[in-house]
Amino acid sequence: MNQLLMQRLTRITDEERRLLDGQNSVDKGIYTDAKDFVVDSRKMLAKGKLIDIRPNTRFVHFPNHRHNYVEVIYMCSGQTTHIINSSVKIVLKEGDLLFFNQHTYHEILPASQRDVGINFIVLPEFFDVSFQMIEKDSVIGQFLVSTLCQEENEGRYLYFE
């Protein structure tokens, strides 16, 4: 990966600075106003945007949560450990991708400064056009059909090594 880009991605965010300065847990108010920990796209995306990126929060256990959008995590360097639906443990390594639909609960174990993951925050509407180009019989196509049609409330994920 481009060295300049990696320098930018490994920078300590304001949230991470507070964690390093002694705050010992995630400030849920950054992510949601709801009692249940559902990360809200309205807090993560600028109005009118369908997709955005942000770095994974490091240095702290990110508690069990889900999103009201599709999340795609790309691991740029190092590794992060994800516990999915309280039972499946996945260690995401450099170059790996992990997709979550809106019903998947997961938590993330603490990461170091060199463990750089990028979260793609994607509203389901983003896939309206791209979905037409994806073969519906493929693994990604089936995942998108179940995610976009919301006919089920089952937490699903895709993991690519």
Q: Can you annotate each of these PLM segments?
A:
Residues 1-2, 72:
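Gram-positive cell-envelope targeting signals
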Residues 2-20, 24, 41-42, 111-161:
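A hydrophobic/aromatic-rich effector-binding and dimerization subdomain
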Residues 34-35, 46-47, 53-56, 82, ...:
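Short amphipathic alpha-helical segments, especially helix-boundary/capping motifs
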Residues 49-142:
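N-terminal regulatory/effector-sensing and dimerization cores
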